[in-house]
C-alpha cells in the first residue's frame, strides 16, 4: 500500500523534506527522475536514507497527484529533450493511494499462487487507474514476482480516496 500525501507529515515538514531532496539531487549533479527517501522520527526530525535513480513501482501515485507522466518525461530526457517541468511549479492535487494485487495465498504466508486467470473483472472510472499486463487467460508463473496489477485511486480528499479504493477493490473479481 502506498499513500500520498502522507497524513502524518505536515505541509511545512513536507516542504522542508522536498527542499532537502532537491539539494541532495543538485549536490550529486542528478538531473533525471528519482526518489529520495527519508526516515521520520517521533520528534518530527527526518534523516536521509537513500536516493533511487530510477522510476519506482509506486510512481503512479505521484503521477496521479501531479498530472505528470513520469515515464514519458524520463524517455523525453533520455532522448536529449529538455525537462518541461520546473520543480517549483509541480504541485500535488488531492490524495492518491496504490494497492498492489498479488497472485498469492494470504492464508499460506503469501506464497505465490500460480495458474491461469479464468476471470478478470476490474472496475474503471474517474480517479481509478489499473496498471496490469494480465487478462482472463493469462498464466501466472511461480517463477516471477506474483504482483499482477496495481490499483491506483485518486480523489480530492483522503477520506473520499479511501472510499473510492474500497469500492474499486470490492468490485474486482479475479479467479
Predicted regions and their residues:
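ATP-dependent carboxylate activation and anion-phosphoryl transfer catalytic cores
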Residues: 1-175
Amino acid at each position: 500500500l502506498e499513500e500520498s500525501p502522507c497524513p502524518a507529515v505536515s505541509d511545512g515538514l513536507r516542504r522542508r523534506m522536498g527542499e532537502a531532496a532537491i539539494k541532495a539531487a543538485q549536490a550529486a549533479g542528478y538531473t533525471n527522475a528519482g526518489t529520495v527517501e527519508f526516515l521520520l522520527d517521533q520528534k518530527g526530525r527526518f534523516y536521509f536514507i537513500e536516493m533511487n535513480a530510477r522510476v519506482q513501482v509506486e510512481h503512479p501515485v505521484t503521477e496521479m497527484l501531479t498530472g505528470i507522466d513520469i515515464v514519458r518525461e524520463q524517455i523525453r530526457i533520455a532522448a536529449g529533450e529538455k525537462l518541461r517541468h520546473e520543480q517549483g511549479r509541480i504541485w500535488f492535487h488531492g490524495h492518491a493511494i496504490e494497492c498492489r494485487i498479488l497472485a498469492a495465498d494470504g492464508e499460506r504466508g503469501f506464497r505465490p499462487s500460480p495458474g491461469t486467470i479464468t476471470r478478470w473483472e476490474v472496475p474503471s472510472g474517474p480517479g481509478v487507474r489499473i496498471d496490469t499486463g494480465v487478462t482472463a487467460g493469462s498464466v501466472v508463473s511461480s517463477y516471477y514476482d506474483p504482483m499482477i496489477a496495481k490499483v491506483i485511486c485518486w480523489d480530492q480528499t483522503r477520506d473520499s480516496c479511501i472510499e473510492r479504493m474500497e469500492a474499486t477493490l470490492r468490485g474486482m473479481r479475479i479467479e
